[in-house]
Amino acid sequence: MARDFSRAQRVSQEMQKEIAIILQREVKDPRIGMATVSGVEISRDLAYAKVFVTFLNLSAGEESDEEMVENGLKALNEAAGFIRSLLGKAMRLRVVPELTFAYDNSLVEGMRMSNLVSNVVKDDEKRRHKEEE
């Protein structure tokens, strides 16, 4: 019977859970704020992992948000060794992957798209209401 998921996919899912727990409970850097792990891409040999994070305390597209993201990513990449050591204790792997953190803007982009759609719907309702009068 064939497996539906490769080992790398299973490891990346487990890493996502464990890193989220580590960020929530162990990392105390205020620059990180409310970071969530949205995904993990891992190399086939399990040597490198790219961790995608989002920051929940951002508003839609402000200048200060970009600075907060840069500071948060810098703090996460500086703490990558510490997070990797805790990850090694939490997971049973022969080699714990080297971690790099990247910002996942899909949440902010989704909020922006949702706002655009709701604005178009409001405008359409206003036009329809004016035509009825």
Swiss-Prot record:
One GO location term (cellular component): cytosol
SUPFAM superfamilies: Ribosome-binding factor A, RbfA
GO MF, one example: ribosomal small subunit binding
Lineage top rank: taxon: Bacteria
Gene Ontology biological process terms from the UniProt entry: maturation of SSU-rRNA
Cell location: Cytoplasm
Family annotation (InterPro entries): KH_dom-like_a/b, RbfA, RbfA_dom_sf, Ribosome-bd_factorA_CS
Keywords for the protein's UniProt record, in alphabetical order: Cytoplasm, Ribosome biogenesis
Family per record: Belongs to the RbfA family.
Protein role: One of several proteins that assist in the late maturation steps of the functional core of the 30S ribosomal subunit. Associates with free 30S ribosomal subunits (but not with 30S subunits that are part of 70S ribosomes or polysomes). Required for efficient processing of 16S rRNA. May interact with the 5'-terminal helix region of 16S rRNA.
Matching HAMAP family: RbfA
Subunit structure: Monomer. Binds 30S ribosomal subunits, but not 50S ribosomal subunits or 70S ribosomes.
Record protein name field: Ribosome-binding factor A
Source organism: Proteus mirabilis (strain HI4320)
Lineage, opening ranks: Bacteria, Pseudomonadati, Pseudomonadota, Gammaproteobacteria, Enterobacterales
Gene: rbfA
